[in-house]
């Protein structure tokens, strides 16, 4: 758990540093119009001296202009670090239950748990990028970046094929395939998570589906539900802490998680509106993407 906490904390710092050039660019190029309007509306007793304020804004602009090129030079290091760190804490999340063979149902307990959690996080990551990109395109009325998303979608089915091969091959090696089709409580949850991932990823083998925003969205949702359920199965459904011990998240815990998600959505909306997160459509060849999207969707 210490390793997981340390990796997540470090990873969060790395993500902030990766995003910092965008913030610095905004500080350097912005006219600070909203901030100036806010200051102008302050009561005279609270309003700062305008000349000093203008000087401080110029200082912030100049500092941002000096720091950003320096950060750009070392950004590749943080990008590599940002890719490496998740492989550590994601596999560690699987390793946590290696010491509990008597408490985790045999359908999920395996020596391959670190590998399965690592592959699981990768295909979930690609799927959430597809889901978020499509939702953002509709929410902010931007063209869907179908070319880039279809490229990601080509990778997902092969990753899930490896994951499913390890899952099913391990069950066969441990003589647990019969337990997987017993259709009891644990078997149903196992089949549900495997089925959702298999169906969602299997759809992406078809080129027409990969070029259809609607079907890309459906497949991403199925994979996310199946991949997320796999983790619930390992840590909640299939885990038995022992006689007299039970655990399920309380309403307060669930609401805290919901609040975190709501805060992340709010922060996302603020950031994409305040800093240049989205690329300019005219500079990235998406002027005709709406037409391409509709044509490909009809073909699918």
Locations of regions flagged by a protein language model:
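Long, contiguous internal "core" modules enriched in hydrophobic/ aromatic residues
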Residues: 1-209, 282-288
């Amino acid at each position: 758990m210490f390793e997981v906490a340390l990796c997540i904390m470090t990873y969060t710092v790395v993500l902030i540093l990766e995003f910092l050039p965008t913030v610095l660019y905004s500080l350097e190029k912005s006219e600070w119009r909203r901030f100036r309007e806010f200051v102008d509306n302050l009561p005279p007793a609270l309003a700062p001296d305008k000349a000093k304020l203008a000087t401080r804004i110029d200082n912030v602009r100049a500092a941002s202009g000096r720091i950003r090129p320096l950060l750009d030079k070392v950004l590749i290091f943080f990008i590599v670090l940002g890719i490496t760190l998740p492989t550590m804490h994601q596999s560690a999340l699987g390793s946590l239950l290696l010491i509990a063979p008597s408490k985790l149902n045999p359908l999920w307990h395996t020596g391959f748990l670190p590998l399965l959690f690592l592959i699981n996080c990768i295909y979930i990551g690609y799927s959430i990028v597809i889901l978020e990109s499509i939702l953002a395109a509709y929410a902010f009325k931007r063209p869907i970046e179908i070319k880039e998303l279809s490229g990601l979608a080509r990778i997902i089915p092969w990753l899930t094929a490896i994951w499913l091969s390890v899952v099913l091959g391990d069950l066969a090696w441990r003589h647990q395939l019969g337990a997987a089709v017993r259709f009891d409580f644990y078997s149903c949850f196992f089949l549900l998570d495997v089925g959702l991932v298999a169906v969602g990823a299997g759809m992406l083998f078809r080129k027409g589906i990969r070029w259809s925003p609607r079907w890309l969205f459906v497949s991403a949702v199925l994979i996310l539900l199946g991949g997320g359920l796999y983790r619930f199965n390992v840590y909640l459904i299939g885990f038995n802490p022992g006689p007299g011990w039970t655990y399920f998240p309380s309403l307060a815990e669930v609401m805290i998680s919901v609040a975190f998600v709501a805060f992340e959505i709010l922060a996302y909306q603020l950031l994409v509106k305040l800093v240049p997160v989205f690329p300019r459509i005219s500079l990235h060849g998406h002027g005709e993407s709406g037409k391409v999207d509709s044509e490909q969707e009809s073909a699918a």
